[in-house]
Amino acid sequence: MSVPEEEERLLPLTQRWPRASKFLLSGCAATVAELATFPLDLTKTRLQMQGEAALARLGDGARESAPYRGMVRTALGIIEEEGFLKLWQGVTPAIYRHVVYSGGRMVTYEHLREVVFGKSEDEHYPLWKSVIGGMMAGVIGQFLANPTDLVKVQMQMEGKRKLEGKPLRFRGVHHAFAKILAEGGIRGLWAGWVPNIQRAALVNMGDLTTYDTVKHYLVLNTPLEDNIMTHGLSSLCSGLVASILGTPADVIKSRIMNQPRDKQGRGLLYKSSTDCLIQAVQGEGFMSLYKGFLPSWLRMTPWSMVFWLTYEKIREMSGVSPF
């Protein structure tokens, strides 16, 4: 064995396989954040489906009056009518999704920042580069994770279907994957991918770009160091911006992914994300695009804090340089 090979074997795993290590660390941090904040995500999804105007086209009272009003009453209604643990319905595919999504977006963003775009000599990273990098990272990560996101959204609505007397569509996560694949083929697993990546581009422009920009601004221009205080302040900002930018696209995405489909996998309510946008605004008003904003913001902010604090800490513990 040559000397370089022997030296490489002695290096820590994080140095031998840096991208794979960052992918796994991102997935671990995202799993912690998802488990902690998932009930807010479920509440948000239920709110976004309430009073859906396009359901009137299906007839037979398909569009029902909203059973709950507001975030708190929606959450309490789920607990009273379905049980406390139903607040985590769909969490398994959500974790699957974030292992792929967060791993993909974080590795992509860092690669673009360090290798493709590059920082200036004074370690400054221009905002326009960060915006493009954040959007590209979101698109790539979300496209890879679309099948798991589709299953998550549909499973989150199963409890509501049961209360409405409708048959359940899935027995579990793996049955959901198998059924969607059988009914719509590979294409069916990527239903709603266009609004999904549109949302991911906006959310990551808010999350990754804001966190990276605020953090490095604080480190380079204030007495604050690269520590938990800086990470916390940066993540608070990123959670707010991500919610403002991402909620309208999230409403469109959720509706397209949850709509009934024909045998060819085509949606019965919306032809495209643009069609869904137009129907929502015309039938329910502009503010329908911000249905679920409060739980989205209340979820995104703690999610962002838990994720970034966990991610920075486990990078430090694993011997990986700070983000």
Swiss-Prot record:
<dbReference type="InterPro" id="IPR018108">
    <property type="entry name" value="Mitochondrial_sb/sol_carrier"/>
</dbReference>
<dbReference type="GO" id="GO:0031966">
    <property type="term" value="C:mitochondrial membrane"/>
</dbReference>
<dbReference type="GO" id="GO:0010917">
    <property type="term" value="P:negative regulation of mitochondrial membrane potential"/>
</dbReference>
<keyword id="KW-0812">Transmembrane</keyword>
<comment type="similarity">
    <text>Belongs to the mitochondrial carrier (TC 2.A.29) family.</text>
</comment>
<dbReference type="GO" id="GO:0008284">
    <property type="term" value="P:positive regulation of cell population proliferation"/>
</dbReference>
<dbReference type="GO" id="GO:0015108">
    <property type="term" value="F:chloride transmembrane transporter activity"/>
</dbReference>
<feature type="transmembrane region" description="Helical; Name=3">
    <location>
        <begin position="127"/>
        <end position="144"/>
    </location>
</feature>
<feature type="transmembrane region" description="Helical; Name=6">
    <location>
        <begin position="288"/>
        <end position="311"/>
    </location>
</feature>
<dbReference type="InterPro" id="IPR050391">
    <property type="entry name" value="Mito_Metabolite_Transporter"/>
</dbReference>
<feature type="repeat" description="Solcar 3">
    <location>
        <begin position="226"/>
        <end position="317"/>
    </location>
</feature>
<dbReference type="Pfam" id="PF00153">
    <property type="entry name" value="Mito_carr"/>
</dbReference>
<keyword id="KW-0999">Mitochondrion inner membrane</keyword>
<dbReference type="GO" id="GO:0043524">
    <property type="term" value="P:negative regulation of neuron apoptotic process"/>
</dbReference>
<dbReference type="GO" id="GO:0043025">
    <property type="term" value="C:neuronal cell body"/>
</dbReference>
<dbReference type="GO" id="GO:0051562">
    <property type="term" value="P:negative regulation of mitochondrial calcium ion concentration"/>
</dbReference>
<dbReference type="GO" id="GO:0046324">
    <property type="term" value="P:regulation of D-glucose import"/>
</dbReference>
<dbReference type="GO" id="GO:0005743">
    <property type="term" value="C:mitochondrial inner membrane"/>
</dbReference>
<feature type="transmembrane region" description="Helical; Name=4">
    <location>
        <begin position="195"/>
        <end position="212"/>
    </location>
</feature>
<dbReference type="GO" id="GO:0045177">
    <property type="term" value="C:apical part of cell"/>
</dbReference>
<dbReference type="GO" id="GO:0005739">
    <property type="term" value="C:mitochondrion"/>
</dbReference>
<dbReference type="InterPro" id="IPR023395">
    <property type="entry name" value="Mt_carrier_dom_sf"/>
</dbReference>
<feature type="transmembrane region" description="Helical; Name=2">
    <location>
        <begin position="88"/>
        <end position="109"/>
    </location>
</feature>
<comment type="subunit">
    <text>Homotetramer.</text>
</comment>
<dbReference type="GO" id="GO:0035356">
    <property type="term" value="P:intracellular triglyceride homeostasis"/>
</dbReference>
<dbReference type="GO" id="GO:0042803">
    <property type="term" value="F:protein homodimerization activity"/>
</dbReference>
<protein>
    <recommendedName>
        <fullName>Mitochondrial uncoupling protein 4</fullName>
    </recommendedName>
</protein>
<feature type="transmembrane region" description="Helical; Name=5">
    <location>
        <begin position="229"/>
        <end position="248"/>
    </location>
</feature>
<dbReference type="GO" id="GO:0048839">
    <property type="term" value="P:inner ear development"/>
</dbReference>
<dbReference type="GO" id="GO:0009409">
    <property type="term" value="P:response to cold"/>
</dbReference>
<keyword id="KW-0472">Membrane</keyword>
<keyword id="KW-0813">Transport</keyword>
<keyword id="KW-0496">Mitochondrion</keyword>
<feature type="transmembrane region" description="Helical; Name=1">
    <location>
        <begin position="23"/>
        <end position="40"/>
    </location>
</feature>
<keyword id="KW-0677">Repeat</keyword>
<dbReference type="GO" id="GO:0015078">
    <property type="term" value="F:proton transmembrane transporter activity"/>
</dbReference>
<feature type="repeat" description="Solcar 1">
    <location>
        <begin position="21"/>
        <end position="115"/>
    </location>
</feature>
<comment type="function">
    <text>Facilitates proton transport across the inner mitochondrial membrane and may dissipate excessive proton gradient associated with oxidative and metabolic stress at neuronal synapses. Regulates glutamate-induced proton conductance in astrocytes, shifting the energy metabolism toward aerobic glycolysis and lactate transfer to neurons for ATP synthesis. Can transport chloride ions with lower efficiency. The transport mechanism remains to be elucidated.</text>
</comment>
<dbReference type="GO" id="GO:0022857">
    <property type="term" value="F:transmembrane transporter activity"/>
</dbReference>
<feature type="repeat" description="Solcar 2">
    <location>
        <begin position="125"/>
        <end position="217"/>
    </location>
</feature>
<keyword id="KW-1133">Transmembrane helix</keyword>
